Each structure stands twice: as structure tokens, then as C-alpha cells.
Amino acid sequence: MASSNGLSLQEIADLVGGQLLDFSDCINDETNSSDGAVQGKSPSVEISSTICTGAAPPAEAGPQQITLIDQANHAGQLADSQAFAVIAPEYVAASPIRLQILVDDPHAAFTKLVSHYRPALGETMPVSGIDPTAKVDPTCQVHPSANIGANVEIGPGCTIAPGVNIGAGCQIGADCTLHPNVTLYAYCQLGERVTLHAGTVVGAHGFGYKMVDGRHIPTAQLGYVVIENDVEVGASSTIDRGTYGATRIGEGTKIDNQVMIAHNCQIGRHNLLCSQVGIAGSCTTGDYVVLAGQVGLKDHIALADGVIVGAQAGVMDDLAPNQVYLGSPATPQRDQMQIMAVQRKLPEMRRELKRLTQRIGRLSEALEEQSADIDQRKAA
């Protein structure tokens, strides 16, 4: 997400209390100092003065933006990133990005930087009415009780129903319908022909906490939500904003009532998510995925294209393409049907096991008695 609040690389380093170094000469050298440590150099004035237009996660950062890596062994995340600089806790040798700002706490530094580029995030809801800086197409129908925040842009043909709240910086494409009491937090983006049913909340704070002195302290949730064209979201569903970048709902996806999608999730195109589905943070789904009612997904897993997951399944691992999965933990349909067939026989199997155990007990007693008789005869 680009910003007009551009900073030079040196200004960013000063803002976050880091050291800006250029490691371009270290690409082919594991070390370049007498003590074996890799030594970057201070970049030229020209490079230090380069303006950075925004901050985003590696996969989202553009060529004039800066990104983040919290551990050197996560360098693979930077392989396809377009960012021209990275904030890191130490020199990242495997990084293709050679301009690095080294800091003690990358997340704290990145939080400060993202807050600079998106300062209105805390001003999520307008006080009342339509902010004078908002741009609402004259063909829109906006109920008088709706609230529209600063710098919001709403395209032609949209319908904004009673009680809708649209936070600062949101962008809404043509022919969208927001039913009563829908809430969009700051910087959310809707494509064209998006329908959000009553009570839906888009862009709320992600469920992220860290333990500090025995207390759960909220972590920064400074991202936003992108909902692409022709998406429909049912009543009272919730889609949390990303930590730094976007939680994304792909084109044509249909989401039922009371569905929960957590921060950083990337939902593919033309998915069907049925009622009470719960998707934990940083999950990815491919295209044409179907999740039946009350399916739950563990965080940081990926479902490939064409996956179908049956009702009430619990998904704990990545799922292969074009397969049907059932049960908890979710397993391929054929395997789960065999498990279910055995489960139905468990009461009968338990009774049979009890009978066999009793029979073995009687046989064991008889053998012991027979053995004792043989011993007595031998003794006589």
C-alpha cells in the first residue's frame, strides 16, 4: 500500500533507530573483515536519499517500498520480493535485497514505520456523517445515518444502507452494496460488485498478542483488507486486517453468514465458505476451494486448488489439490470413510473383545490347573 508520506532510507533508519548498510559488495563473500564478520558499508548520499513510498510484507512490497524479515533464516521470503530495502535484526546473507537497515527489534521498528505511512489507522471511525474529504460518486445512494470517514473513495452505483460505518482511507469500487450496520475499518479496499450483508465487520484488529510480565499485550495490527470483484459476504461475518499488509479475499468468492477469517489470510478466487467456518491466521486457500459448515483451519496452512472439506472437519496440515477431506483431523475421504465404518462397529467390537477376554481368562485358568496337576503327578 503506497503512501504520500515518503521518507528517504536514511530518514527511515533514523526513525526506527537502525543502521542503514549496503551489502552489495558482499554478495560473493561470506566474510570481508579480519574477524570473520560480514561488513556492510554506508551507502552513497544518492542511495541514502532514495525515497521509500511505503512499507509492506515481502510478498506485497513494491519496487519503491521497504519490507521486513524477523529472522535471517527466513530469507526465502525475500526471494521474489520487489522491495528495494529490508529491515532485519542482522545481516541477511541469503537476501537478494542488499540495502538493509539493522535493528534490535524488527517488529517494533516496522510497526513504527507502518504507523508513519498509515497514520489515520487509529481514527478508524468518523464522528458522524460524511467527511468533507470523502469522494462519493453522485450516483450512489447513501442513507443519512451512514458515516463515511476521511479520504474515503466510493465509486458509482453503490448503495450504503443505514448504520454503515466506513473508516478513513477506504476505497470502494462501482456497484457495491453495504447492508445495514456493516463496518469497514480504515484502509479497507472493495472491488466492484461486492456485497456485504448486515452486521459484517471488515478490517478489525487481528487476534495477535504477546506475553509481557504475565499479561497478554496486543501486538501491532496495522494492515488492511482487500476484497476483490464479485465477492459476497454473509451477515455477521468478520474478516480481520493483516498485521502489516493485506488480508485478501479473491474474486468471486462467496462467504456465508457468521464466518471468521483471521489476519493475513489469503483466500483464493471463487471459494465457497459455508456458515461458521473459522480460518486461523495466515492461512492460504487456492481457487475453487469449498469449506462446508463449521470447518476449522489451523493457522499457517495452505489448501491447494479444488479442495473440498466436509462439515465440521478440523484441518491441521496442508491439503493436496482436487481432493475431498473429512473428519478431524481432516483426512482424505476414502480413508475417513474406512475410519467411520470401523467406528460404527466399535460397540460390537467392544462386546466381542470382552467375550474374548473372558474366554482367554477361563482358558488360562484351565491351563494353570492342568499344569498344576501335571506337576503334582511328577512329584508323586
From Swiss-Prot:
The active site is at H263. Keywords: Acyltransferase, Lipid A biosynthesis, Lipid biosynthesis, Lipid metabolism, Repeat, Transferase. GO terms for molecular function: N-acyltransferase activity. The keyword 4Fe-4S does not apply. GO terms for biological process: lipid A biosynthetic process. Pathway: Bacterial outer membrane biogenesis; LPS lipid A biosynthesis. It is an enzyme of class 2 (transferase). InterPro entries: Hexapep, Hexapep_transf_CS, LpxD, Trimer_LpxA-like_sf, UDP_GlcNAc_AcTrfase_non-rep. It catalyses: a UDP-3-O-[(3R)-3-hydroxyacyl]-alpha-D-glucosamine + a (3R)-hydroxyacyl-[ACP] = a UDP-2-N,3-O-bis[(3R)-3-hydroxyacyl]-alpha-D-glucosamine + holo-[ACP] + H(+). Its EC number is 2.3.1.191. GO terms for cellular component: membrane. Belongs to the transferase hexapeptide repeat family. LpxD subfamily. Homotrimer. Catalyzes the N-acylation of UDP-3-O-acylglucosamine using 3-hydroxyacyl-ACP as the acyl donor. Is involved in the biosynthesis of lipid A, a phosphorylated glycolipid that anchors the lipopolysaccharide to the outer membrane of the cell. This is UDP-3-O-acylglucosamine N-acyltransferase. The lineage of its organism: Bacteria, Pseudomonadati, Planctomycetota, Planctomycetia, Pirellulales.
